[in-house]
């Protein structure tokens, strides 16, 4: 894959990247794609997968757990534990 393709993917939203990745998987599963094209779209799929993983990781890092006092009222937030 070219750097242009990676740059193109970097601008994708999570939803757009997942939709294209699903399309690639469907094409590869059908088996009606020439070998060279299969390799090319597989490589693009790998880039899309990595992009989705990075977006999910960034979102996970932004999520906070709300702390409650004894009465159950919110008193602040802290980073979500990674289990």
Curated annotation (Swiss-Prot):
MF-aspect GO terms: exodeoxyribonuclease VII activity
This protein's UniProt keywords: Cytoplasm, Exonuclease, Hydrolase, Nuclease
Subcellular location: Cytoplasm
A GO cellular-component term linked to this record: cytosol
GO biological process: DNA catabolic process
Keyword ATP-binding: no
Annotated EC: 3.1.11.6
EC top class, as a word: hydrolase
InterPro entries from the UniProt entry: Exonuc_VII_S (IPR003761), Exonuc_VII_ssu_sf (IPR037004)
Catalytic reaction list: Exonucleolytic cleavage in either 5'- to 3'- or 3'- to 5'-direction to yield nucleoside 5'-phosphates
Family: Belongs to the XseB family.
Subunit structure as annotated in this protein's UniProt entry: Heterooligomer composed of large and small subunits.
Function: Bidirectionally degrades single-stranded DNA into large acid-insoluble oligonucleotides, which are then degraded further into small acid-soluble oligonucleotides.
PANTHER family noted in UniProt: EXODEOXYRIBONUCLEASE 7 SMALL SUBUNIT (PTHR34137:SF1)
Protein name, per record: Exodeoxyribonuclease 7 small subunit
Organism: Allorhizobium ampelinum (strain ATCC BAA-846 / DSM 112012 / S4)
Annotated gene: xseB
